[in-house]
Amino acid sequence: MTHSSQDTGSCGIQEDGKLYVVDSINDLNKLNLCPAGSQHLFPLEDKIPVLGTNSGNGSRSLFFVGLLIVLIVSLALVFFVIFLIVQTGNKMDDVSRRLTAEGKDIDDLKRINNMIVKRLNQLNQLDSEQN
């Protein structure tokens, strides 16, 4: 037989309700058997279980503290990654500017090389004509 998690949760609430009823009946019996003022009875508010509280509050708060720490560390890592992306973008801009400048330098060197080759060809033609 399988029970869903809701069935087990509702079963726990029913058991709490049964315990509350039994405590209430015991309190009524004590009132009927004991004279007034001879026994200090706890107010009913102390015996009514509050749905939001249980004995696992310590583990629940520990869970939330751990979750908070994980979120803070994650946020720090995200900011670090964003910082690295910005720095990498700046470095890429620098490299791009250098390559553009070097490309212009290379074009200038090619132009100078062509001028030298033309001059050498002219000199070779002059030498061949003189011979």
From Swiss-Prot:
Cellular location(s): Membrane
InterPro entries: DUF4577 (IPR028099)
Chief localisation class: membrane
Organism: Homo sapiens (Human)
Membrane topology: Single-pass membrane protein
Sequence positions bearing Phosphoserine: S24
Entry coiled-coil feature ranges: 90-125
Presence of the UniProt keyword Transmembrane in the record: yes
The name this protein goes by in its record: Leucine-rich single-pass membrane protein 1
